Amino acid sequence: MFKTALVTGGNGNLGRLVAQNLEAMGTRVVSFDLPGSEGPHCDPRHAVVLGDMRDQSLLEDTLATHKPDVVIHLASMLSGSSEANPELAWDVNASSSIRLMRHCLDRNIGPFFFASTAATYGPDLASPVALTR
C-alpha cells in the first residue's frame, strides 16, 4: 500500500473516514485542513497541517516535509458557501486543486485522487446515490 498519504480536507466528514481507513491499512496520514477544523474528532495519530489550500508555499512545504507518495484531495468549499462567493469558490475548488496537482507532478508524487461532490448531479438526488448513476 502507501507509506504516507496527504489527505486534504482530512478533518472533514469524508476526510476523517478516508484517513481512518488508510491508518488501518498501515499508511501514515497527514491531514491538511483549515484552522478551526481540528478538535476531539481528529485522530491524534495523524500529522495535521492547518492552512488554506490557496497558501501555495504552505502546500509546497507540506509536500517537501512529509513526502507523501499518494494525495487524496478532498478539500473544497461546500455548495452553500460556494454559491454565496463564487469567485472564492473558484479559487479554492478549481485553481487551488490544479496548483496542487502541478506541485505533485513536479515532485513525482502519485497517485492523486480527487473526489467531487454529489451536488455535481443536481439538487434532487435520492440518498444514497447508486454508483451506476
Task: Give the ranges of each region predicted by the language model.
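N-terminal Rossmann NAD(P)H-binding glycine-rich loop of SDR-like oxidoreductase domains
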Residues: 5-25
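SDR active-site strand-loop-helix element
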Residues: 8, 32, 71-75, 112-118
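Conserved glycine-rich Rossmann-like NAD(P)H-binding loop of the short-chain dehydrogenase/reductase
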Residues: 27-38
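Rossmann-fold cofactor-recognition segment
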Residues: 43-55
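A hydrophobic alpha-helix adjacent to the NAD(P)-binding/active-site core of NAD(P)-dependent oxidoreductases
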Residues: 48, 89-90, 104, 112
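NAD(P)H-binding glycine-rich loop region in Rossmannoid oxidoreductase-like domains
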Residues: 53-92, 123
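Conserved cofactor-binding/catalytic machinery of classical short-chain dehydrogenase/reductase
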Residues: 55, 70, 96-99, 111
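Conserved Rossmann-fold NAD(P)-dependent oxidoreductase catalytic core, especially the SDR/UDP-sugar
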Residues: 98-133
